[in-house]
Amino acid sequence: MSKLFYITHKEIDFVKWDQTILNSKAPLVFAQSFYLNATSAGWNALIGEDYKSVFPLTTKSKFGINYLPQPHFTSQLGLFGDFTKEDLNFCLDYIIKKYKLIQIELNHLCNHSATSKCTFVIDYKKPYSFNENTKRNISRAQNNGFKVEEVKDNDAILLSQTYLVPFLKNDLGLNEEAQSVFMILVKNAAKEKKLHTFKVINTNEEVMAIGTFISNGKHTIFLKGTNFDKKENTGSMHLLVSHAIKYFEGKSETFDFAGGSLSAGLAGFYKGLGGEQLNYGYLNINNLPWYIKLFKK
């Protein structure tokens, strides 16, 4: 077992941190510093000697009580790098003692008896295929004259604000804080040259669908996307995501649909595009004082 130490945000060496994440067996973009800086401003960490292993602490405070929530647009954190089961247990014991409320998702390598959540992924080292329904939808979009275009980062930021922020608000019911986090994340990813945005346009050059993706060269996530032909069901979203999957093949090891709490329809959509289910743990521990629990109700 290697000793891990509590390190404040200003003391973290982001270069070493990111090297550990990228060299990890789970090189998840969620855990990179530019991503955490957007989704959990001021985050702290537990860090092993010479950054051998790292555990981000996405701390927040309310009513004078520190708690550990899962950040927006993030599906797996936990311990990364070269670690043992004892190291993981040390981290979990530490946060249980330090935080009264813990609601975090652990990456799939943190084998722990937590509640299970899932995402869908494509491992590019393995064969994958689109199902017949997906192929029909792609053909429908192509027959309608739809085509996919990659969007330059400056335009992508504008399109994200124009199309995706209203989608987050009106369709997903996310609050202004989450909408702000999303735009900070998009801008951070663009600055780091890790943002990829695609749009589907029709024969009149009208936007029919848009999707944003973030990739670190090993792990690619489908951040958010929406289409504007839901009633017509013209297949624009199938066309867009299938294009992205092919685009990142050879440029990434894994394509992650970035799930969590998935509806049956969304799970079916991901499966149809070749996604395989990947389970990971959700740690939910509530040791809040009784009067806070009563207030939360």
Feature roles, as predicted:
Residues 75-82:
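The substrate-binding groove and active-site-proximal loops of carbohydrate-active enzymes
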Residues 85-118:
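Non-catalytic accessory segments adjacent to catalytic cores
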Residues 41-43, 97-101, 195, 250-254:
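Short, high-confidence coil segments that cap the C-terminus of an alpha-helix
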Residues 103, 149, 254-258:
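Short catalytic-loop micro-motif centered on adjacent basic/acidic residues
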Residues 2-50, 57-64, 106-112, 117-232:
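A conserved beta-strand-loop-helix scaffold within acyl/acetyltransferase catalytic domains
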Residues 118, 122-124, 286-297:
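C-terminal "cap" of GNAT-fold acetyltransferases
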Residues 61-75:
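Conserved acyl-donor/pantetheine-binding loop and adjacent beta-alpha core of acyl/acetyltransferases
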Residues 90, 194-292:
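Aromatic (often tryptophan-rich) hydrophobic motifs at membrane interfaces
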